[in-house]
C-alpha cells in the first residue's frame, strides 16, 4: 500500500513539474525570450526546459515537452517567424513535420541518453552535461535533416544554398547552422544540465545514490 501511495505521489509530483515547465515555455513565448535574436543569431531557449524535463523525469517527459516546444515553433510559423512563415506558405504539412515530430524525438532521445549515461557516471559529474549537449545536437540534426528532406529542392531553400555557396545538402547544413548551433549547444550544456542537476539534488535522487554507493 505504501509503495502504491509513493508511486502515485511521485506521479503527481512529476505532473506538477511538467506543468511548471510548460508554463515556463509559454511564458518564454509570450515575452519573446524563447528565441533570443542578436548579431544575426537566433538562440533557442525553449530547448532548456525540454532538457531539464528529459533528464529529471525521463524520456517520456522529454518527448512531451519536446512536443510542446514543437507546437510553439509551429505556431510561430503563422507570422512571428519569417523563416517559418515562408515554409508554411510552401507546404503546411511539411512545415508541421519539420517543427513538431523532430522536437518530440529530440526530447525523447535526450532523456534516453541521460538514462544510459547516468548509470555509468557514478560521480554525477559528466552525464548531465553530456545529455544536455546531445539533446541540443539531436534537435539541430533532426530539424535540419527534416528541413532538407522536405524543402531542400524548393526555390526558397535553394536561395539559401546559393547565398551560402554550398554545393550539397551536408555543406548547406554546416553553413546554415554555423555559430548558432555551437551557441545553442553551449547554452543547453551549461544551463540545462545545471538546472536539471539542481532539481535532482532537491528531489534527493543524487544524494541517495551517493549514500548507496
What are the residue ranges of the model-derived segments?
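Loop-helix junctions at membrane interfaces
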Residues: 1-213
